[in-house]
Amino acid sequence: MNQKALKSLEYYKIIDQLTEKASSQMGKDLCRHLLPSEDVYEIRHMQTQTRDALTRLFQKGNISFGSVKDVRGSLKRLEIGSSLGISELLAIAGLLENTNRVKAYSRNERGDAREDSLDGMFESLEPLTPLSAEIRRCIISQDEISDDASAGLMHVRRSMKVANDRIHTQLASLVNGSARNYLQDSVITMRNGRYCLPVKAEYRSQVQGMIHDQSSTGSTLFIEPMAVVKLNNDLRELGSKEKEEIEHILDTLSELA
């Protein structure tokens, strides 16, 4: 069918209306690229599919695809051996979980023994439940990987907690003891990824350590006491190991996808 005929029939206006009804970006893209068939057998088959789809909708209600993210770019990256990030893996897990819900929309679930033209389409769906479950087990949210994602990550994070506790114990003893009178506030703060104390500038020589920052007025120096320099170094090294372990976890999940 030529473009002139399509315009005369206002075909693209119909496509625009259909596209607005699609709840996912991938669905919208499919709608935009639909073209009418000129094959009478294909037309009859698609009409049968439309009728069967309406029957399912009337019997069981609508299927939601609104939560589905566009993962086509991620799948292309996997094809060339790239590893995916947290948000990409969560999007794939969400798609697979939605696939599982859609598959439950089968003929047997409707309690209807009659076969229809959509059965094969639903039966071909593979939710890959073990993969989505593993992604959810390892990734808690966009910003957090579970401690249980790997034995290595759990070990590193336990070591980080021990190091953090030791640093806070050392600094608390200074805040409540020998450095008490030299501090602007009795708080432990962080500067450049290092735990520091807010020392009054005039008492700089009374607190041995490294200056990492100062207040806008210059009245407060943020000093990392010598007593915690090695502990801070250990903590930073553990932080690097944590990042490496997380990258390894994401690599492993990407290989499974």
Predicted features along the sequence, with ranges:
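Conserved amphipathic alpha-helical "coupling/scaffold" segments
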Residues: M1-G152, V156
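SMC-family hinge/dimerization module
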Residues: V187, R191-F222, N232
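Signal for well-folded cores of large energy- and translation-related assemblies
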Residues: T19, K76, I140, H168, ...
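Charged, surface-exposed helical/loop "interaction arms" that form contiguous linear patches used
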Residues: E144-S159, E244-A257
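Extended, Lys/Arg-enriched charged tracts that mediate electrostatic binding to polyanionic substrates
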Residues: M154-Y203
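Coiled-coil heptad-register positions
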Residues: F58, R107, R114, L171, ...
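A short alpha->loop->secondary-structure connector
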Residues: R110-R114, Q214-G218, G239
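Internal alpha/beta scaffold segment
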Residues: M226-T252
